[in-house]
Amino acid sequence: APARFSQIFEEPLAEMVEMLQQRGFACALELGSEDVLLTVRAQYIRRILDNIGSNLIKYADPARPIEVRFLRQEGRAGLVFRNHVLPAPPAVESTKVGLTSIETMMDKMHADCKIEQENEQFAMTLLFPVE
């Protein structure tokens, strides 16, 4: 059943931010005021945010804030996560595992996952169909 964006993301996002803050990361959230209706699987959302959180802990530069922003695009809405990566991550392969499982879960929800990396800037966009 469709649920409001705030209902879906509030708790798992708060948990992710708390986990990051405990490890010395600063998070800047811009969630806007538009509360769209999305149909998602709550357990996937939790696991996706868990994965994103642990990726950030491994690869993000703690000296730079992690940005989480609400995004509305045509018939879709979701979140953009942006961070700076530390120079020369030890083993890039391990990020791929987390990213693949995120992409799989997003597929199952008919949602899109886009990953962009430019120099030390990393961005992941999650977009869900709006009801």
Features from the language model and the residues they span:
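Conserved micro-motifs of the catalytic ATP-binding
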Residues: 1, 37-40, 111
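Glycine-rich ATP-binding loops of the HATPase_c
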Residues: 110-118
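Short beta-strand/loop element within the Bergerat-fold HATPase_c
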Residues: 63-75
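Short helix-loop "hinge" at the ATP-lid/N-box region of the Bergerat-fold HATPase_c
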Residues: 55-57
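A conserved beta-strand-to-alpha-helix junction within the catalytic ATP-binding
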Residues: 1-14
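Glycine-rich/acidic phosphate-handling loop/turn and adjacent ATP-lid/helix
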Residues: 78-100
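Conserved catalytic submotifs in the C-terminal HATPase_c
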Residues: 21, 26-36, 84
